[in-house]
Structure formats: structure tokens, C-alpha cells
A protein has these predicted regions:
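Transmembrane alpha-helix boundary signature
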Residues: 47-60, 72-83, 98-116
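N-terminal transmembrane signal-anchor/hairpin module of polytopic inner-membrane proteins
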Residues: 1-56
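C-terminal ends of transmembrane helices
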Residues: 15-28, 67-86, 141-156, 199-212, ...
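Membrane-interfacial segments at transmembrane helix termini in multi-pass membrane proteins
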Residues: 245-305
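Cytoplasmic-side transmembrane-helix entry/capping segments in multi-pass membrane proteins
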Residues: 28-39, 59-62, 81-93, 156-168, ...
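Structural signature of hydrophobic alpha-helical transmembrane segments
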Residues: 1-13, 50-68, 123-138, 184-195
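Transmembrane helix-loop junctions at the membrane interface of multipass transporters and ion channels
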Residues: 103-117, 182-187, 214, 221-242
Length: 311
């Protein structure tokens, strides 16, 4: 990677950080969004200027198709439907991580990580972990999208031994990753993908539709770590930095939301977020989850309200 490319990626990373800073407050959100767009533009132009790019025609076609689809969705989407749109986009990031890892496994020479059957241990670890996170993100986001859109029931789906099955699957994925890094067997690679797909579903189905915003934020974190995994596979510092930013900010936001709703952050990670609601469904029906707010929340709602009624 040339010095100029490294410098451009560094500038993009700084712009992404400033973008997150701007998006943290309504008054600076527009500026933060602009800085994010600018950073992404610099990153794309820098990547396309790489001499290693083989076909601008194929990239141009992909840009055109993706741009048309994205523009069409952005024009038609309602503000109330943004959470499920974000969940759908997260699923694509996870699937991309799986595809990149598969490409690196079957054609490692294209990624400068050795040859088939003799990939370095470090690259195998990065590849397999990125694959697992990406696969979990993909299926988890699909279920979240379905719940928010109404394609899947928003009621928590809880069954006996659920956490035990999740634990077994988690340990099984770890064992498969270790075995894959030793044997470099393609069957093990796809077993990792399949097991991660399954646990991604099992982690989200016990969560109620009303609590989906927290899960979307958590899946945002997962997609960030998946992107960071892609960055390690591609030896791309910008992807690593950006993925880490998205991953950490998504996790922090999820923690803040859980704290504000008196929920356990650990339950989000373990897929037991909706369990308490499901277990207490037969109790007093008038119980509601208390939602905390502060002066900043009240000021924001009043500032953006068209009509205010004071009783």
C-alpha cells in the first residue's frame, strides 16, 4: 500500500470519527452525515485508484445497479420503516463478510495470503472469525427485519433448553474454528457458516418486536466487527478502523438503551432479551416497561413537534 493511499485512508478514518461525533446530537447531525459521505467518497476513490483493480467495467455495473436500488429505496422508504431498513442493510454486510472469506479461502493468492492448503494460521483465524460473525449478523438481521416488517410474529419465541442449545452451538463453532485453522478443510468452513446461520436465528427469535430497536443496534455492532474481519482478510486498514468504530459504537448504544429500559445487556448477547416478557405474559396485563428520559430528550421532542398540548 502506497504512502498516498495510506494517507487517504487515514483522512477517511478521521472523517468517519468526526461523522460519529456529529451524529451524536440533533443540531450537528446534518454536518455529521456530510462528513460521513465525504469520508466514504474519499475511501471509494482511493480504492478504485489502486493499480490492482482488474475490471472497472464490472465495478461500474455493480455501482450502477446498487445505486439505482439504493436510491429507489431511499426515495420510497417512510421514516417509520427505517429500523427494518437498517436491519436489512446489516444483513448484507454480514453476507458480504461470508463471501469475502469464502473468496479468500478458495483463492488465497488473490489476497496475498498464500496458496490453497497452505494459508497462514493468522489469516485462517481472521477468516473464520469474520465468517462466523458475518453469518450470525446475516440471519439475525433477516429475522429482525421480518419481525419489524410484520413478516414474522413479533412475539418472543421461547422454548425449553434454548440457552443450552445456544451454548452448545457456540462451543461447537469455536471447536470448528480451531479444527478448521489446523486442517484447512472446506467442509469445516461451511459447517462454521451453517452453524453460525443457525445460532443467528436462535439469538433473535426469543426477542419481542417491541424490543427490536435494541437488537438492531446490537446487529449494527455485529456488522461492524464483520467489516473489521473483512479488513483483516483484505489487509485494509480503513475497513479495520471503520469496522471497529461501528462495532464499538453499536455496542455502546445498545448498552445505553438497555440501561434506559432496565434490561440486561448480557441477555441481548445471549438471546434471552424477550424471555422475561414471555414468562410473565400470564401475569398482570396492564404492566408496562418503564422508559426513562431526560431534559435533552424532552427538549428534542418539543423542538421537533408541530403541535404541543399542555394539560
Amino acid at each position: 500500500m502506497s504512502t498516498l493511499t495510506t494517507a487517504a485512508y487515514l483522512v477517511s478514518s478521521v472523517l468517519f470519527i468526526l461523522s460519529l461525533r456529529g451524529l451524536s446530537h440533533p443540531s450537528t447531525a446534518r454536518r455529521g452525515n456530510f462528513l460521513g459521505i465525504l469520508g466514504m467518497t474519499i475511501a471509494i476513490v482511493t480504492t478504485l485508484s489502486n493499480p490492482g483493480v482488474l475490471s472497472y467495467k464490472e465495478i461500474g455495473i455493480a455501482f450502477l445497479i446498487g445505486g439505482l436500488i439504493g436510491t429507489s429505496i431511499a426515495v420510497k422508504i417512510q421514516m417509520t420503516a427505517l429500523p427494518q431498513l437498517v436491519a436489512a442493510f446489516h444483513s448484507l454486510v454480514g453476507l458480504a463478510a461470508v463471501f469475502v472469506a469464502a473468496s479468500a479461502y478458495y483463492n488465497p493468492s488473490a489476497f496475498n495470503i498464500g496458496t490453497v492448503g497452505s494459508i497462514p494460521m493468522g489469516s485462517l483465524i481472521e477468516m473464520s472469525i469474520g465468517t462466523a460473525i458475518g453469518a450470525v449478523t446475516f440471519t439475525g438481521s433477516i429475522i429482525a427485519f421480518g419481525k419489524l416488517q410484520g413478516f414474522v410474529s413479533g412475539n418472543p419465541l421461547v422454548f425449553k433448553g434454548q440457552h443450552f442449545i445456544n451454548l452448545l452451538l457456540g462451543l461447537g463453532i469455536i471447536a470448528l474454528i480451531v479444527k478448521f485453522c489446523i486442517d484447512q478443510n472446506q467442509e469445516l468452513f461451511w459447517l462454521i457458516v451453517f452453524a453460525s446461520f443457525v445460532i443467528g436465528v436462535l439469538l433473535i427469535v426469543p426477542i419481542g418486536g417491541a424490543d427490536m430497536p435494541v437488537i438492531v443496534s446490537m446487529l449494527n455492532s455485529y456488522s461492524g466487527w464483520a467489516a473489521a474481519g473483512i479488513g483483516f482478510t483484505l489487509s485494509n486498514n480503513l475497513l479495520i478502523i471503520t469496522g471497529a468504530l461501528v462495532g464499538s459504537s453499536g455496542a455502546i448504544l445498545s448498552y445505553i438503551m438497555c440501561k434506559g429500559m432496565n434490561r440486561s445487556f448480557l441477555n441481548v448477547l445471549l438471546g434471552g432479551f424477550g424471555g422475561e416478557q414471555a414468562a410473565s405474559a400470564g401475569g398482570v396485563k396492564d404492566d408496562r416497561q418503564a422508559k426513562q428520559g431526560n431534559a435533552a430528550d424532552a427538549a428534542f421532542m418539543m423542538k421537533n413537534s408541530k403541535t404541543i398540548i399542555i394539560v
